[in-house]
């Protein structure tokens, strides 16, 4: 028999939540899918001929890009031969330096990285983040938007946000043709509030690049990458086109970061039976291979997908750690 107090608590909406049953065949699984590949690597004449159980002849465009651009070959065979649990313990060990860890992890394949972080519990993942994060001083980003896309209000709000200490500001646009007004209003307002604040206007990628080239924005981060070939193709993209876009931003001196996150592939219906974390490890490998300055990940807009399956939030934390490895 329960008291009325516990009956009332149990009836609250927040306590009606539950988890979706895992469905590995369609990728509705956060970690350790039975269909995830086993880590492996073979190098011949300075070229990766096998990666994660797949021969080069069978590589899709992500595999080819990752093999050619995202893995340090000099130490790869030695690093891949190490026991995953040993690497995981090194990540947590306060006596092992960040540089020593990177010497190993930058030579690992996506499947191996997934296996390594899979050995860690949530507290160990946080300990690893404490050591592995590259940024010495944390900074905050804010969004400055309003229902009517009123540039005067955007400028005023941006100025206040600058005074409050935000390092980056983003605006989004309801009507695409208003984008230049929003971008300029955000830029002017932010600099009035505190000179040096970085601003962006999130749009379709070609338009966003144009705004940057014209000097209306100072960074971009909504350059999405995905973990399977069909999702890339759904957006008329490839890892190579994204890398080219990154070089365009770099040529103008604009800061930019890729965007990815666990759950996007299963949400699009093209997870190929792989776990969300493994697919995100592939995204992060593409990000590193393209040489961009950073990544916006942690599931972001897809958080409801991993959060709805067992171990999902642990997988999101694990992908953040992989981004630092």
Language-model-detected regions and their locations in the chain:
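Anaerobic metallocofactor- and corrinoid-dependent redox/one-carbon enzyme cores
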Residues: 1-155, 163, 170-325
């Amino acid at each position: 028999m329960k008291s009325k107090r516990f009956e009332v608590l149990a009836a609250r909406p927040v306590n009606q939540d539950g988890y979706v049953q895992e469905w590995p065949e369609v990728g509705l699984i956060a970690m350790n899918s039975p269909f995830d590949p086993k880590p492996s690597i073979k190098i011949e004449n300075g070229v990766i001929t096998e990666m994660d159980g797949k021969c080069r002849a069978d590589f899709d465009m992500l595999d080819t890009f990752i093999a050619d651009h995202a893995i340090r070959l000099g130490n790869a065979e030695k690093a891949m031969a190490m026991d995953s649990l040993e690497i995981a313990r090194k990540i947590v060990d306060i006596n092992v330096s960040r540089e020593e860890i990177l010497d190993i992890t930058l030579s690992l394949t996506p499947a191996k990285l997934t296996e390594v972080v899979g050995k860690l519990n949530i507290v160990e993942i946080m300990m690893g983040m404490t050591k592995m994060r590259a940024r010495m001083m944390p900074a905050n980003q804010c969004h400055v938007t309003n229902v009517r896309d009123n540039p005067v209000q955007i400028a005023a709000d941006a100025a206040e946000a600058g005074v409050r200490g935000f390092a980056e500001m983003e605006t989004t646009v309801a009507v695409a043709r208003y984008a230049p007004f929003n971008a300029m209003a955000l830029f002017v307002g932010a600099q009035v509030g505190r000179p040096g604040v970085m601003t962006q206007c999130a749009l379709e990628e070609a338009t966003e690049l144009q705004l940057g080239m014209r000097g209306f924005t100072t960074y971009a981060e909504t350059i999405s990458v995905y973990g399977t070939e069909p999702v890339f193709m759904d957006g008329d993209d490839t890892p190579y086109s994204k890398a080219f876009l990154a070089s365009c931003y770099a040529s103008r001196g604009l800061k930019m970061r890729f965007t990815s996150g666990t759950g996007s592939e299963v949400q699009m219906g093209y997870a190929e039976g792989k776990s969300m974390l493994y697919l995100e490890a592939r995204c992060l490998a593409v990000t590193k291979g393209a040489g961009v300055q950073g990544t916006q990940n942690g599931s972001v807009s897809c958080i409801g997908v991993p959060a709805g399956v067992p171990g999902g939030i642990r997988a999101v934390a694990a992908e953040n750690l992989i981004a630092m490895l």
